[in-house]
Amino acid sequence: IQSTSMDQGILTEDSMNSFIRTLIQGGIWKNKVPKQTARTKDGMQTTVKKTEAEADAMASKDTRLGFQPVVSVDAELLRQQRRFSSPRVLLSENTPLEPPPLYLTEEPMVLNRTSRRKREGKSHRGEYSVCDSESRWVTDKSSAVDIRGHQVTVLGEIRMGSS
């Protein structure tokens, strides 16, 4: 996943909820529980959701084997969702050209407008890779903790378009 620093606006909770609904409707949400076919006593086939424990066991097995899930994302879906700007990341069809520069260390917060204007001029704009909270590059993570404290899977690759 490529990410881009954005200065286009603040991401609201409503816009994020709308984006998540779109992802769910597109069938690409991470927590989609796999289904399996089972036969009842009378021989009829039924579709049964796997239990959460079975799904977790499969995910754990896949992680041990070095498998990282690959999700196909329609490029048009991402183009439609560009209005959901985030100050942190933007899904991009382009790969980053190089690792990002480290953020400039800025002077402590001062409550005066002049220094605020000075600080705003130091922002970096460009394509950024994912890094952890210790500010060192991480390229082999298969799971992470999101901003709400939930454990999530880090995708190794996202295929875009019809290929």
Curated annotation (Swiss-Prot):
Glycosylation sites: N112
Molecular-function GO terms, alphabetical: growth factor activity; nerve growth factor receptor binding
Keyword terms of this UniProt record: Cleavage on pair of basic residues, Glycoprotein, Growth factor, Secreted, Signal
Disulfide bonds listed in the record: none
Basic and acidic residues compositional bias, start-end: 123-133
GO biological process, one term: nerve growth factor signaling pathway
Coiled-coil stretches: none
Role, per record: Seems to promote the survival of visceral and proprioceptive sensory neurons.
Protein name (database record): Neurotrophin-3
